[in-house]
Structure formats: C-alpha cells, structure tokens
C-alpha cells in the first residue's frame, strides 16, 4: 500500500480530512494553562489570603484571577491594621465584569477564604453558580476560615453559621483545620478515628472531598504534624516534621496548592494521595525556609521552588 492510501480516524477526523476543529480544540485544551478565580482577603504587607495564594499558584503554573474581599495594610494577627472591607456590591461587580468579558467560561476552579463581611457569602455562592453554569467542569474549593483551637474564632459571630449553612453545602472541596471541622460538623474532633468520621459528616453536607490541613492527635508520633484527605474513595494521611512556629497564611497556601494539585491530578473523587503528598511537601518546605530565616511572615518568595519541585517527599498512607 502506498503512503497516499494510509487512512486514520482521530477524534472526529474523517478518513481523508485534515485535522478538524474538534481535534484542534483538543490540542488547545491539552496545552491550556488552568485558571483559578480566587475570592479572598488581600494585605499589602505579609502573605495571607490572596497575598499568599496568588503568587503561589502562579509559580505552580496556574492563571489566577484575584478578587479581594478586604484590602488591609496587614493581617489582623498584628492587633492593628488599616484599610477597608470591600462591600459585597463591589465584589459582585468585579466578578460580573469578568463574566461580561466571557472569561468565566475558562475558569477551572474557584477558591475562597477569609470573607470579611457577612454579605460576601451570597456573592461567593452566586459566583460559584455562575461559573459552573459557564463551565460545568469547574470545581469550588472553600477554605472555611474561622479560627483555631488555640485562639478560638477570629471572625465575626455571624460568619461561622453562614459558612456551615450556606457556603459549605455548595462546595466540592473544603479545607478546614481540626477546629473548623469540629464546628462545621458539631462533632468533637480529637483522634484519627473521630477526625475521619467528622470529615465524612462534612461530606454529607455537600462537599465531595475534605482536606484537614493540620491534624494534632494524641496518638501521633512525637515531633510530627499531619494532614488528612478524605473523599468517597477513602482517607489518606501524611505526616511531616513539626516545626515550632505558627505563621499566618500557611493554611491559605495549603488550600490553594491542594486545589491546584486536584486540578492537575486525578480529580476530587479519586485517589487523593498524590494531591495530598504534593501539598504537604510544599507546605513543609515553605515553613522550614521560614523557620530557618527567622522571619515573622511566610518566606513565600524565597521558598518558591517548593511549589514546583519540593526537595523532600513524605509517605502517604491510606487509613480508611
């Protein structure tokens, strides 16, 4: 047979056709950089909210469209700050403007964190519904920022019930710490068994996957801290060395990287071990670099290689 007689049929190509528009679209989709709409706080000094998530995700290879819910001089952990909470109407206008450009069609994920005013919840819910209308494959990852076991809640009293009753039910993924998971589910969360059970209880509220960003349980090995990921396919645990520091924004970075790793991995309903392992390795290296520098803020820029090629990997174990 001469070469002129060879025929093939590739993804919709007729036998004697040049590549079709559909085939070209497939190639373009393969090469497209994923886009993430990030609705969070912003600070001028330091790295929390969008000031943590945007650079991290961009360095990891994602397009990020930040929408700010507050515009503060610094995070509130300093005890003093200046700047406004962004009115919900203004946040809505920014998202509306993106949609009017036709760009919500290209959103692969929406992430949200610290909300500022209580009326931001409705804007986020509307944005998620609109983005999924434009692109049904888009996922929404919610970091239900409320507080932690040591300092308690650091948001206004009306935020936690709004997160629990309105925002979490529309999320595909949530990324609470143990304290936040306990509040959302109304359960005591202490050991591994109760943490997994609470994660599944949270899944019954709507999300498919849960990342517990910091697990401190009495039965863990001394000198370690853990992360837990749970979905309908199982539960996975990873331990990293415990570093004696707490820096605001580390949870924001973890939530952002986990969402990015899910987009590049096996989805939210499959094996979460790769996304969990990659996230834990990057966060540990970021905290290690920060600890060694003695900086009071995350060394987000200095540690940037960790978001792509972390030096150290940690074993991920299936525990459920």
Language model regions located:
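Glycine-rich phosphate/adenosyl-contacting loop at the front of the ribokinase-like
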Residues: 3-86, 314-320
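Charged C-terminal helix
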Residues: 17, 23, 270-320
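Glycine-rich, highly charged phosphate/nucleotide-binding loops
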Residues: 83-100
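Membrane helix-loop-helix hairpins that form the core translocation module of multi-pass transporters
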Residues: 108-130, 139-148
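A short helix->loop->beta-strand "cap" motif at the edges of active sites that frequently abuts
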Residues: 131-139, 206-208
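Conserved phosphate/ATP/ADP-binding segment of small-molecule kinases
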Residues: 155-235, 245, 264-273
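Short glycine/threonine-rich catalytic loop with a Thr-x-Gly-x-Asp
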Residues: 241-258
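Short glycine/serine- and small hydrophobic-enriched flexible loop segments
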Residues: 256-264, 281, 285
């Amino acid at each position: 047979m001469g070469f002129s007689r060879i025929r093939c049929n590739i993804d919709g190509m007729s036998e004697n056709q040049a590549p079709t528009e559909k085939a070209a679209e497939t190639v373009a989709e393969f090469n497209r950089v994923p886009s993430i709409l990030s609705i969070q706080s912003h600070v001028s000094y330091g790295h929390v909210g969008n000031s943590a998530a945007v650079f991290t995700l961009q360095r990891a290879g994602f397009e990020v469209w930040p929408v700010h819910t507050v515009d503060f001089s610094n995070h509130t952990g300093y005890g003093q700050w200046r700047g406004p909470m962004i009115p919900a109407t203004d946040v809505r206008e920014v998202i509306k403007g993106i949609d009017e450009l036709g760009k919500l069609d290209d959103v692969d994920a929406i992430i949200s964190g610290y909300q500022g005013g209580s009326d931001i919840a409705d804007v986020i819910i509307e944005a998620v519904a609109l983005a999924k209308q434009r692109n049904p494959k888009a996922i929404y990852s919610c970091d239900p920022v409320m507080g932690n076991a040591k300092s308690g809640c650091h948001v206004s009293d009306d935020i936690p019930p709004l997160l629990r009753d309105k925002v979490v039910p529309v999320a595909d993924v949530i990324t609470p710490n143990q304290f936040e998971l306990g509040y959302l589910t109304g359960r005591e969360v202490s050991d591994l068994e109760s943490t997994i059970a609470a994660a599944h209880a949270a899944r019954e509220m709507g999300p498919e996957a849960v990342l517990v960003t910091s697990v401190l349980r009495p039965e863990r090995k001394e000198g370690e801290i853990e992360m837990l990921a749970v979905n309908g396919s199982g539960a996975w645990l990873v331990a990293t060395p415990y570093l004696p520091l707490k820096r605001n924004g580390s949870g924001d970075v973890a939530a952002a990287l986990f969402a990015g790793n899910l987009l590049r991995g096996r989805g939210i309903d499959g094996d979460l071990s790769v996304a969990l392992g990659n996230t834990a390795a990057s966060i540990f290296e970021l905290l290690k670099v920060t600890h060694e520098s003695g900086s009071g803020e995350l060394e987000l820029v200095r540690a940037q290689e960790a978001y792509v090629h972390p030096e150290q990997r940690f074993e991920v174990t299936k525990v459920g």
